[in-house]
UniProtKB/Swiss-Prot annotation:
Its EC number is 2.4.1.-. Thought to be a Golgi-localized beta-glycan synthase that polymerize the backbones of noncellulosic polysaccharides (hemicelluloses) of plant cell wall. It comes from Oryza sativa subsp. japonica (Rice). Residues 1-48, 54-73, 269-295 are annotated as: Disordered. SUPFAM superfamilies: Nucleotide-diphospho-sugar transferases, RING/U-box. GO terms for cellular component: Golgi membrane; plasma membrane. This is Cellulose synthase-like protein D2. One of its GO terms (biological process) is plant-type primary cell wall biogenesis.
Length: 1170
């Protein structure tokens, strides 16, 4: 069934990858890597109903030409029997390089599925979408079939997708049949003339391989042995299951080298004797540096730009002054009670004490703001310029895996996700180092086909962007630019190219938007066909009996006429959102290592791309397995599944995650982030956070959707301590930091001002030396040497995944091109080609995304994205900082990424509710900053403490917003009299607040309007969503009631009628009740207070002015909320008036009943106020 060389995999409609070992406890199929056996390729067939079943005995007999009888006992055994034919003169294995290329083409055209208690299947996709796939890297790309009778294999193809025909007669022949023809005389089956080239290497260019020495004993090098590694093997390390030879020991301890790509440099005294210069001399195990490193002038990749002292020093001084004034004011308030209204005084003092603490927690982390700058020219010079160690100028940049997450195509339109994918594929980063993984947590065919359409359109869009330096590289945003698109474009063919691409994009949008109807019509047609067949079979079987109605589950069908293994439109068993198999489809296979330039007028490419590299990055569709009874852990679980599958398939040492509605606005953003990771000291940076920027927001930013105070003030300030918090998207991670390892040279901080006034600590030399030697460390282990036998307990039983960890650690190191660079790697180490994909690799990826893989491991606890909170992003970043990792805030001149934000009031409140609920969960969990380790700086701890505490301010804020109204109702005030001392304190506190705001605006670059909008929404959110979050958090902690949230709906991006239509839609929610009541009560209180003062015998204007001033202060903050209730033309839902009026009247009457006015207060002579 399978050729002995492993290269000629013949398959029918689908292939099945079955695991060979099973655990005795639950029958769970073990991962191939876990047991050491690589997955075996066997076969299955597709039934008329679209399902896959193993070949029956009759099928196998007919396929193999066997007419003899087989016993029932041997039949089942035969189904999974694997025959390996030994090599003979008539049966020689295919060349490994050609075999790997053929298998990669098979893998890229197969849909892999599998999971719990099921085999892993590889279904060959003849077509992925209704339209034709034109790019040779794309799944289902057009290819010819072999012309030999009885052979349905694909013809060999080159990197452009063109058929490779070894004879001048252009007879189409596959690799297996060509090898057979050569053995049987070397004559072409078509024209019968002898082949001029009889070696596959002459027909298909052999893939370059690493110049590693062969392992002893003539054993073939395995896939993992061809990868880089840096860790020395240990006895406890997981061994290769050959039984004869420990490949890991040979890999980690060999003296072979391949230039500076080896993990161990020669000693200093060996550099001049052939150890350096890229020649590949012997290894001494030392850590000396080649001479060429020290001879080059060294330039940093990044610079820290400090805030001018003329701005920062007054800013810090004002913080101290305001802190002192607040302390004196609170002390004065406590001493001077209002005997006439003790209840009013008590409530106000408690609220003011909390506000003072809240302001302190918010302000202290802002003491050390910094700005940073990158130098992309230096990055290019260091990593992409020909050098003695890299004579061809191949990119030495590390690999980068991009994660895009989506869950529901109904709320996250496929067109938005497709545009995000296109912007990633077109990014300015080495194509062979970039991989994009799309996580579809809903398992929807709509998302799958939308991604396939995006991969097809990328064939034209990506080269067009590279040719004309297009910005931004999101087609929807680019074609909607309001500026002149032809400005600064020098190529004469730009106008023609742009018009053609615009026309193609309009057709692409039509195809994407019509996918739901297309899938529904296709599924209905196939379902009707299956019902007719079932009824026909039933009639034939029933004869004259009464025929009952046929009930067949209505499946969702793919474009090639097979069942979709994920979620069906009408959910069924094993095909629902929470119950479906794991799915992996390589939409775009890994590109070749060398540039591939297009041609003019080429079929499928009507544009001239003769000077443009037309390769595309690898694109993979992933939908993790979900089964009832397993906690899927929402987005965090999906991200962890991507971490594991990407480690098996590409293992980029860095990971960047984006939400489906956040696209790449700056094509060089990846390079900017990599500058920080590759600079001196970059090995201690756990992640680089980019600011979030938004589009489609109303010009006045009514609900502070831009959130610039947080992103430009708070985050810049945190960058001066240990770094910004992780905000969920637009973040570049170091892979081993996500794995839970400690950073190199981690320190403990005991001082409270270590960021502004660092203290030097004496560290033992032996300790430093051991940290430099040790590549991977975890605080959980006391051993100086990492015990690799513990890795399966942490990361699971996948050897592929475990073996990839030291590789990712080494590839993520900065260049050791300066004496100050610690824990670096030599230049040229990452210029080697990356391995081709094979079936066993993708099968292993299926295994690690199964629903059971995380059982009894530390995924979600200490490894990967952390579970247990709706704000898993903040918790994940906190854990990294708690281990000692640093983070960096990368603010680029041109926005790195842009996304969408909910401009509707209700959606915005629910978004804030979700964030605040996560903060409450953090406060009541072990992730509370009060329990942080000593590796976290004091001010960073304060910042995280504020993250967990800020929702509780809502309790005191609501009380304080009612105080002005209560003051006006009662005729009292929070102080006995408005004396000079109180007014002086109030004036100084207000002035210092305004001056601090001005200075923050100065060093952060935000506008005064943005600062004011933030203040307004702070009160709106604090009196609505934050209060609900506190109540929900307390219910979860006390009563164990779980909290669930729905996805925030994203705009489809194609609403041309009114860009801000959502802004005027009023959707009722209970979160609106508290702000409405506050507004109505304060308005009524102003009217009551004003009437009482006018008609009283002794008017107390000072108390009236004090109450009215604070009431107007509250109402001014709630103005955007009131405006949002008015809708487009002042149309407010009747329910709003009913609820607010009833509640306001009830509160007013309740107050009058509790504290009625004195009988001698006459209003208008005869009228007595009740």
């Amino acid at each position: 069934m399978a050729s002995s060389g492993g290269g000629g995999l013949r398959h029918s409609n689908s292939s099945r990858l079955s695991r060979m070992s099973y655990s005795g406890e639950d029958g769970r199929a073990q991962a191939p890597g876990g047991g050491g056996d690589r997955p075996m390729v066997t076969f299955a067939r597709r039934t008329h109903s679209g399902r896959y079943v193993s070949y029956s005995r009759d099928d196998l007999d007919s396929e193999l030409g066997n007419s003899g009888d087989m016993s029932p006992e041997s039949g089942q055994e035969f189904l999974n029997y694997h025959v390996t034919i030994p090599a003979t003169p008539d049966n020689q294995p295919m060349d490994p390089a050609i075999s790997a290329r053929v298998e990669e083409q098979y893998v890229s055209n197969s849909l892999f599925t599998g999971g719990f208690n099921s085999v892993t299947r590889a279904h060959l996709m003849d077509k992925v979408i209704e339209s034709e796939a034109s790019h040779p890297q794309m799944a289902g790309a057009k290819g010819s079939s072999c012309a030999i009778n009885g052979c349905d294999a694909k013809v060999m193809s080159d990197e452009r997708g063109d058929d490779i025909l070894p004879c001048e007669c252009d007879f189409k022949i596959c690799a297996d049949c060509f090898a057979d023809a050569v053995k049987n005389g070397g004559a072409c089956p078509g024209c019968k003339d002898p082949y001029k080239a009889t070696e596959l290497d002459d027909v298909v260019g052999a893939r370059p391989t690493l110049s590693l020495p062969p392992p002893p004993g003539g054993l073939p090098a395995s896939r993992m042995e061809r990868r880089l590694s840096i860790m020395r093997s240990q006895k406890a390390m997981t061994r290769s299951q050959t039984g004869d030879w420990d490949h890991n020991r040979w890999l980690f301890e060999t003296k072979g080298t391949y230039g500076y790509g080896n993990a161990i440099w020669p000693k200093e005294n060996e550099v001049d004797n052939g150890g350096g210069g890229g020649g590949g001399g012997g290894l001494g195990g030392g850590d000396g540096q080649p001479a060429e490193f020290t001879s080059k002038p060294w330039r940093p990749l990044t610079r820290k730009l400090k805030i001018p002292a003329g701005v920062l020093s007054p800013y810090r001084l004002l913080i101290l002054i305001r802190m002192a004034v607040l302390g004196l004011f609170l002390a004065w308030r406590i001493k001077h009670k209002n005997e006439d209204a003790m209840w009013l005084w008590g409530m106000s003092v408690v609220c003011e004490l909390w506000f003072g603490l809240s302001w302190l927690l918010d302000q202290l982390p802002k003491l050390c703001p910094v700005n940073r700058a990158t130098d992309l020219a230096v990055l290019k010079d260091k990593f992409e310029t020909p050098t003695p160690s890299n004579p061809n100028g191949r990119s030495d940049l590390p690999g980068l895996d991009i994660f895009v997450s989506t869950a529901d195509p109904e709320k996250e339109p496929p067109l938005v996700t497709a545009n995000t994918i296109l912007s990633i594929l077109a990014a300015d980063y080495p194509v062979e180092k970039l991989s994009c993984y799309v996580s579809d947590d809903g398992g929807a065919l709509l998302t799958f086909e939308a991604m396939a359409e995006a991969a097809s359109f990328a064939n034209m869009w990506v080269p067009f962007c590279r040719k004309h330096d297009i910005e931004p590289r999101n087609p929807e945003s680019y074609f909607n630019l309001k500026r002149d698109p032809y400005k600064n474009k020098v190529r004469s063919d730009f106008v023609k190219d742009r018009r053609r691409v615009k026309r193609e994009y309009d057709e692409f949008k039509v195809r994407i938007n019509s996918l739901p109807d297309s899938i529904r019509r296709r599924s209905d047609a196939y379902h009707a066909r299956e019902e007719i067949k079932a009824m026909k079979r039933q009639r034939e079987a029933a004869l004259d009996d009464v025929v009952e109605a046929v009930k067949i589950p209505k499946a969702t069908w793919m474009a090639d006429g097979t069942h979709w293994p994920g979620t069906w439109i009408q959910p069924s068993a094993e095909h629902a959102r929470g119950d479906h198999a794991g799915i992996i489809q390589v939409m775009l296979k890994p590109p070749s290592d060398d540039p591939l330039y297009g041609t003019s007028g080429e079929e499928g490419r009507p544009l001239d791309f003769t000077e443009v590299d037309i390769r595309l990055p690898m694109l993979v569709y992933v939908s993790r397995e979900k089964r009832p009874g397993y906690d899927h852990n929402k987005k965090a679980g999906a991200m962890n599944a991507l971490v594991r599958s990407s480690a098996v398939m590409s293992n980029g040492p860095f990971i960047l995650n984006l939400d489906c509605d956040h696209y790449v606005y700056n094509s060089q953003a990846f390079r900017e982030g990599m500058c920080f990771m590759m600079d001196r000291g970059g090995d201690r940076i756990g992640y680089v956070q980019f600011p979030q920027r938004f589009e489609g927001i109303d010009p006045s930013d009514r609900y502070a959707n831009h959130n610039t105070v947080f992103f430009d003030v708070n985050m810049r300030a945190l960058d001066g301590i240990m770094g910004p918090v992780y905000v969920g998207t637009g973040c570049l991670f170091r892979r081993i930091a996500l794995y839970g390892f400690d950073p190199p040279r981690s320190k403990e901080h005991s001082g409270c001002c270590s960021c502004c006034f660092p203290q030097r600590r004496k560290v033992k030399t032996s300790t430093v030396a051991s940290e430099e030697r040790q590549a991977l460390r975890m605080a959980d282990f006391d051993d100086e040497e990492m015990n690799m036998s513990q890795f399966p307990k942490k990361f699971g039983n996948s050897n592929f995944l475990i073996n990839s960890i030291p590789i990712a650690e080494f590839q993520g190191r900065p260049l050791a091109d300066h004496p100050g660079v610690k824990n670096g790697r030599p230049p040229g180490a990452l210029t080697v080609p990356r391995d081709l994909l094979d079936a066993s690799t993708v099968a292993e990826a299926i295994s690690v995304i199964s629903c059971w893989y995380e059982d009894k491991t530390e995924w979600g606890q200490r490894v990967g994205w952390i579970y247990g909170s709706v704000t898993e992003d903040v918790v994940t970043g906190y854990r990294m900082h708690n281990r000692g990792w640093k983070s960096v805030y990368c603010v680029t001149k041109r926005d790195a990424f842009r996304g969408t934000a909910p401009i509707n009031l209700t959606d915005r409140l629910h978004q804030v509710l979700r964030w605040a609920t996560g903060s409450v969960e953090i406060f009541f969990s072990r992730n509370n900053a009060l329990l942080a380790s000593r590796k976290m700086k004091f001010l960073q701890r304060i910042a995280y403490l504020n993250v967990g505490i800020y929702p509780f301010t809502s309790i005191f804020l609501i009380v304080y917003c009612f105080l002005p109204a209560l003051s006006l109702f009662s005729g009292q005030f929070i102080v006995r009299t408005l004396n000079v001392t109180f007014l002086t304190y109030l004036l100084v506190i207000t002035l210092t607040m305004c001056m601090l705001a001005v200075l923050e605006i100065k060093w952060s670059g935000i506008s005064l309007e943005e600062w004011w909008r933030n203040e307004q929404f702070w009160l709106i959110g604090g009196t609505s969503a934050h209060l609900a979050a506190v109540l929900q958090g307390l219910l979860k902690v006390i009563a164990g009631i779980e909290i669930s949230f729905t996805l925030t709906s994203k705009s489809g991006g194609d609403e041309a009628d009114d860009e801000f239509a959502d802004l005027y839609i009023v959707k009722w929610t209970s979160l609106m009740i508290p702000p409405i009541v506050i507004m109505m009560v304060n308005l009524i209180a102003i009217a009551v207070g004003f009437s009482r003062t006018i008609y009283s015998e002794i008017p107390q204007w000072s108390k009236l002015l004090g109450g009215v001033f604070f009431s107007f202060w509250v109402l001014a903050h709630l103005y955007p909320f009131a405006k949002g209730l008015m809708g487009r033309r002042g149309r407010t839902p009747t329910i709003v008036f009913v609820w607010s009026g009833l509640l306001a009247i009830t509160i007013s009457l309740l107050w009058v009943a509790i504290n009625p006015p004195s009988q001698n207060s006459q209003i208008g002579g005869s009228f007595t106020f009740p």
